[in-house]
Amino acid sequence: VAIRPLRVGELAEVLAVDFDDSEGIPRLNADWRWEDQEQALLIACSSLIAIVEPGDGNSDVESGKSRVVQFSHFSVKEFLTSSRLSNASGEVSAYRIDSENAHTILAQACLGSLLQTHDEIDGNTSKDHPLAEYAARHWTIHAQFGEVSSRLQKGMESLFDVGKPHFKAWLTLYDIDIRPPFISTFSAFIPYNKSSAAPLYYAAFCGFHDLVEHLILNYPEDVNADGGYYKRPLIAALAGEHFQTADLLRHNGANPHVRGDQESTPLHSAAYFGKLEVVQKLIEYDADINARDEYEWTPLCWSSRGVHFKDGSVLRLLLERGANVNARADDDGCTPLHRASRFGALEAVRLLLEHGADVEAVSYHNMTALQVVGKSNPKAGQGRCAEIRRLLIEFGAK
C-alpha cells in the first residue's frame, strides 16, 4: 500500500517503531534499529521480498540514492492479499495483508518518525530520520484510508500539538497545503495565502473528523482563523469534500463568507467546477446565491460558462434556489445566457431559457446570445451550435 517503492532505510525504520506504547502513540525506539538494514529486512521477510536498485520509472525514488524493497514476484502480493488466505487453516492465515491494517501500520510508522523530528530541519534530517521524508509527504494519505484515522487519534493529537515542535517540522519537510493532494476545488478563485495556518486548518483539510473535534475543543479561536491556501478551515474541509467535518465546523461557528482576490466566493468556484455537493453545502450554510465578484459575475454566471459543465445539476440547483437568471456582468454586460451560448453549453442554454432567461438581452458590445453561439469554444461542434441556435429562436430570438 506504500505510495511509492520504499527504500531499504525507510522500511527498516518501520521495524524500529514501537506500536504498543502505553500512551497509544507510535514511537521510534533507537535501540531497535539494525546496523545492517538489508539483513534485518531479509530476516523479517525472507524470500517474500527482493532488494533491488530503484527503477527508472519511479521519479519519486532517485536512482543511486538507496536500494528499494519489492515483492519477489507479483504472485507473492496476490497470495498475501487474497481473501482465501484469511480462510486458510493454521498459522498461515496470519500472513494475510489487509489493506486497512497495512495503511494503519504505515500511518503509525510515519507518525512515529515525524514525532521524532524537530523544527531544526537540515541536510542531516534524512540521514537521522530515514522515514521522515516519506512520512511528511504521504502519512495523511494512509491515514485517510477507511477508518484508519480513528486508530491514530493519540498520535495525531501529539503531532498537532502547537506546544511541541513536531507540527512545524512536518510542514517544513513538506507542506501538503502548498501542493494539495486533492483536486483543487477553489484554487482559481481563493488565492494562495502564504500566512501559516493553524493545525485545525490542516486537520479540516484532511478530513480528520475526530481530530478536528479535539482541536475545536482546545483551540476554539482557530475556527475562523485566516491562513493557508483556502483561507479558512471550513473552506479547506469543503475543498476536500469532507462534508461531515465541514458540518462540525459550521456547527461550531465557522463562517463560510470569505472572499478571494477578485472578490469571488467559494460558491463562485464550486459552481464553476460543477461541485454539486459543495454547492449544496454552501447554500445550506446561507451563502449568498447572487454574490457578485469584482466583475459583477454571480455563481450562476460561472456555472453557465460550460467549461466544467456536466449534467446541469449545479445550474438547476442555483436557479431553483433563486439565482438571478438575467444577472449582468459589469465587464461586458453579458448574462448567463450569453455565457452558456458562447461556450456551446446546450443543456445550460436549455435550463436558462426554461427559467425565464431574456433571449433578447444585449451585451455592452451590442450582441445577443444568438450572435455569440460557440464563439469561445471551438470544440462545441457545428451540430451542437446549430441546436443552440434553434433553441434560442424557438424561445423568441430574432
Predicted regions and their residues:
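Conserved ankyrin/ankyrin-like repeat signature
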Residues: 211, 244-245, 278, 313-314, ...
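"… SH3/SAM/PH, and C2H2 zinc fingers" -> "… SH3/SAM/PH, FHA domains, and C2H2 zinc fingers"
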Residues: 223, 239, 257, 264, ...
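Ankyrin repeat domain, specifically the short helix-to-loop turn at the C-terminus of the second helix
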Residues: 214-222, 247-255, 280-288, 316-324, ...
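Leucine/isoleucine-rich amphipathic helices and adjacent mixed helix/strand linkers
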Residues: 1-225, 232-251
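Ankyrin repeat A-helix N-terminal signature
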Residues: 202-207, 236-242, 269-275, 302-311, ...
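Ankyrin-repeat-protein effector appendages
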Residues: 355, 374-398
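Ankyrin-repeat boundary/"N-cap" motif
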Residues: 191-200, 226-234, 259-265, 292-298, ...
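Alpha-solenoid repeat scaffolds
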Residues: 120, 149, 222-223, 256, ...
